[in-house]
């Protein structure tokens, strides 16, 4: 199978005991553009995959020529790592390069009448949750998010624009050439000077006004007709099954080997409270253990290691180094024997 771009081959561990099958697969690919990784080593974190590197990730079949072993090893974390290693518009294929087919929601393949087993259905669900989509040919494709275009939001300003236009039109009927026609007492209308405008009475410096009718450059005729759509309740987006799933910790948040797990600054995921509660529980357990080791005054006994009735010429040198004088020539020697008399005269030992 000739392919262009970098290719990653994911092999189950059972294929390593059949080198002839593995060599057959490797012969059909260009070695300088092909990498081979074992799924069990990836699952245990012994090796890592580079991000946005491969154009095609190929899942190899096991020794039984099925993908059962491969599906059983591909958990959620490993699938996300594989998807991150794909480039935008990269594809996830199997060894036979057969299309995965489209699922109809009941676990059935639109291209065949068989029903997927639990591992296959779980694999299909996990790759979709990881961000892959099915293209027109039934292949799993990583969408190119960077190629998508941003759509500007339409602000509902149609009513305000219409009211503003009607107000200006009605004002124009009464104000002409800076005067307002007002009825007089004799039935003759008399011109009255109009109010001063902002040109005649400018706004004082440092004073600003907010125009809430501003449409931010979006024409009123381009506004959406259904601007008052029903809002989606965010509490209904996740059900109990989603809330009970295990949280996947990002690699950058995992503690390094041999180091204690620490929470980020301004932690909002609950890890800080969890670690604080764990520390309090450990401190309480240690304090409780220390309480059992404390002894009362009645349980303490004083031990005297002094040899009774044995003194030297100074009164202490026969008891050992701890009781000898600073200038005693016997410092560093064992204690005298019981009953042995020692006398010092001019710093000379007299036995």
Swiss-Prot record:
Main location group: cytoplasm
Keyword Protease tagged: no
N-terminal SAM-like domain, as annotated region: 1-151
Signal peptide: none
Keyword Disulfide bond found: no
Disordered, as annotated region: 93-118
Domain of life, source organism: Eukaryota
Motif annotated as Cx2C motif 2, chain positions: 325-328
Cofactor(s) listed in the protein's UniProt record: [2Fe-2S] cluster; [4Fe-4S] cluster
GO MF annotations in UniProt: 2 iron, 2 sulfur cluster binding; 4 iron, 4 sulfur cluster binding; electron transfer activity; metal ion binding
HAMAP family: Anamorsin (MF_03115)
Protein name as it appears in the record: Fe-S cluster assembly protein DRE2
């Amino acid at each position: 199978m000739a392919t262009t771009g970098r290719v990653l081959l994911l092999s189950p561990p059972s294929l390593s005991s059949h080198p002839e099958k593995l060599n057959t697969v490797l012969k059909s690919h260009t070695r300088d553009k092909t990498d081979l990784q074992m799924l069990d080593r990836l699952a245990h974190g012994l090796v890592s995959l580079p991000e946005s590197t491969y154009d095609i990730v190929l899942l190899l079949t096991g020794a039984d020529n099925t993908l059962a072993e491969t599906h059983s090893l591909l958990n959620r974390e490993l699938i996300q790592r594989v998807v991150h290693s794909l480039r935008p518009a990269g594809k996830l294929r199997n060894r036979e390069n057969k299309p995965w087919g489209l699922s109809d929601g009941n676990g059935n393949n639109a291209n065949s009448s068989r029903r997927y087993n639990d591992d296959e259905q779980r694999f299909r669900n996990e790759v979709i949750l990881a961000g892959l989509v099915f293209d027109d040919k039934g292949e799993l494709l990583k969408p190119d998010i960077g190629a998508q275009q941003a759509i500007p939001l339409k602000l509902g300003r149609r009513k305000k624009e219409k009211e503003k236009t009607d107000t200006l039109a009605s004002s124009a009927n009464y104000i002409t050439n800076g005067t307002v026609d007002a009825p007089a007492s004799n039935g003759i209308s008399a011109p009255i000077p109009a109010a001063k405008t902002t040109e005649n009475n400018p706004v004082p410096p440092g004073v600003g006004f907010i125009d809430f009718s501003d449409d931010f450059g979006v024409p009123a005729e381009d506004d959406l007709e259904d601007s008052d759509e029903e809002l989606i309740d965010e509490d209904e987006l996740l059900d109990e099954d989603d809330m009970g799933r295990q949280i996947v910790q990002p690699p950058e948040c995992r503690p390094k080997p041999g180091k204690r797990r620490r929470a980020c600054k301004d932690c909002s995921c609950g890890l800080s409270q969890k670690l604080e509660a764990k520390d309090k529980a450990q401190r309480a357990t240690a304090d409780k253990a220390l309480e059992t080791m404390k002894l009362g005054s009645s349980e303490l006994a004083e031990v005297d290691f002094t040899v009774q009735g044995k003194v030297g010429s100074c009164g202490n040198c026969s008891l050992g180094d701890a009781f000898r004088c600073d200038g005693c020539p016997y410092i560093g020697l064992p204690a005298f024997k019981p009953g042995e008399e020692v006398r010092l005269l001019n710093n000379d030992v007299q036995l």
